[in-house]
Amino acid sequence: MKRTSTASPPYAPRRPRRAAAALAASAAVLAALLTPATAGAAPAPAATGAPLPTELEVIRAAEATALYGDPAERPLDQRKTSLISLGDSQISGEGVGNYEPGTDGPTNWCHRSKDAAVHRTTIPADVTYNVSCSGANSANIRIGGSPQYADELVQSDNLAVKARNTRIKQVLVVAGANDDLQFGPVMTDCVTRYLLLQGACNPKYGPGWQARVDGLVPKVTTTLGDLKKVMADAGYTEGSYELVLMSYSSPITPDFRDNPKFPGKLPGGCVGYDADARWGRDTAVPAFQKGLRAAARDAGATYLDGSRLFQGHEVCTDDTWVRGLTVDLSHPFPPDANSVRQSFHPNGRGHAAFAACLSALHGTGLREASCADPGSTGQAVLRAGAWDDAFGPLRAGTGVCLDAKGGDTLNDTALIGWDCTGTRNQGWWQSPDTGAVHIEATHDRCLDIPGADYRAGRSLVLYDCKGQPDQKFTRTGATLRPAAAPDLCVTLTGKDTPARLQNCDGSAAQSLA
């Protein structure tokens, strides 16, 4: 099926533009870094929707004429099918390049890429729409909200138009980072503090982070409810389309030095303190993810957990799906806040991963699903359920839990027995497909037998998940055994003692509940 990637047409200004204050180039590069630049049969939808306000009806008629040759609102069975994405820079294509005309400055910086995920899925559709915009918050999406730029519609209004001209199959939403969380300004501050040698930023933001998450959840919930109302007003019934909220993945990792070709923080674009990278991955993004999951549940939307999707592919890794710190001194010129706006956003490979997840999710009927690279494959794989429900401790009968020593996740981190704390360096999940045992802190590190040395007494470590035999384990009762050496068991004898392979003997140290 030939698919049309449709750029959002320009609209008559709805309110005066605000003049942007000129900034000194060097100050703008630092201060503006990452600041938001802003299954089963379903009831058939109604033939046509409720009338639109006059202003939107004019736009609808013009778009219908472009699609079909005349302005009539067609019955659903006579319409082209479509997909649509709404939200902020995470899904607009910020950082990918190849931006739609009119969205790459100087008066509109939505940065909608022609290579954004919505245009790259394998879901059969005649038309794909990307109405998301870099910097959008819930006020730019919800009913009665405000447009970001004079030539933009509120995103829910854009949805209302598209829903009456096409038969929408999937509505993708990625939103929340620019509400109370202010993820961009926080990232800006963290990077700026590093460049100016001012110390890590996580002590500043950590204590109030959960309150920020709690503040954004009702806004995202309301926004999703508004989008459902828009679809209902357009004649759609529950279940006749998919409403998907996808969560964000951390663009940074503290494990970048495991990249054998690590070029350095500045050349690689992964500027920031290691402690902040660890806080972002282990605390900030997981808390944000939990909030978005709650919003999707409360609104009755499908939840796609993307929180682990970029793990192993962050900035400065050997196969990055994220653009690092990027400063474009020529566009605009002289440089201003927009010179760095592409930094720390998904690149083309990141959007290909989004598209793979969305394609796999379509038509499954799942209310919750999650997506990640199963182990340095370069491919995104979907699984049913959210990641939060997958991980749990491996608690030995001796009373200790399998623990990544010091909370580290670098290659060759020692694994030990330790007091059970419920932290992410003690959470584990075994893939039913590969047998690999992933640690909760990052999907890119697995339980590993160094050198495939299958002998009693061999200590175990964390290592880059690679799908090799030395990372494949089986469960026999409560024991965990190497698939290649089933007479050996993972053994935890006590606190601060190494996790080792020992001959299986039925002891409490080998009973991992």
List each model region and its residues.
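C-terminal region of N-terminal signal peptides and the immediate post-cleavage residues
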Residues: 31-71, 367-368, 459
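Serine-esterase "nucleophile elbow" of acetyl-processing enzymes
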Residues: 62-134, 191-192
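Structural recognition of the beta-strand scaffold that forms the well-ordered cores
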Residues: 82-94, 127-132, 169-174, 179-181, ...
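Histidine-centered active-site loop/cap adjacent to the catalytic His
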Residues: 327-376
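Extracellular glycan-recognition/adhesion modules and their associated mucin-like linkers
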Residues: 379-410, 424-454, 470-496, 511-513
